Regions:
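Conserved phosphotransfer cores of two-component systems
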Residues: 52-54, 78-84, 105
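Conserved acidic carboxylate
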Residues: 11-12
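C-terminal output helix
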Residues: 115-124
């Protein structure tokens, strides 16, 4: 398996959080690209084109209120063909409310805010390691 730069896409509704998470991931040696979730949902930014252009291995997605519509958008996004084989790290402001909606098993990784940015870096690193093992088994 050739070593290539590890790319992470960050999807969030808060511009400040987008910048903070990007800075933390870049300091950890990752290449990070960002998109505002509202731009994706409203079609101002084409999600498929964004993913095809940047080819992220891991996607950090924040499920913000209203949880039901944002969770539904995440599920639709994850099921699209362009997302196959990509790992997701899911963040939220209210873990209990989200778990009541989806149950505890549907999420790759669920982190709560205010979160330690290192938790996101660690979750992305774990997602890459899981992905590498899966690709090695199928190769």
């Amino acid at each position: 398996l050739e070593e290539k730069s590890r790319i992470i896409a960050i999807f969030n509704t808060n511009p400040e959080v987008l910048e903070l998470v990007r800075d933390s991931l870049q300091q950890a040696g990752y290449q990070a690209v960002i998109a505002h979730i509202d731009d994706l949902k409203r079609g101002r930014l084409d999600m498929i084109q964004f993913v095809e252009e940047h080819k992220p291995d891991v996607i950090v997605y924040d499920v913000a209120p209203p949880y039901d519509t944002n969770w539904t958008f995440l599920r639709l996004m994850r099921n699209s063909k362009v997302m196959q084989g990509r790992a997701f790290v899911v963040t939220t402001t209210n873990k209990r409310a989200l778990e009541e909606l989806i149950g505890p098993n549907d999420v790759v990784e669920l982190l709560c805010k205010p979160y330690d940015l290192q938790q996101i870096v660690d979750a992305c690193t774990a997602a890459f390691e899981k992905q590498t093992k899966a690709k090695t088994k199928t190769a």
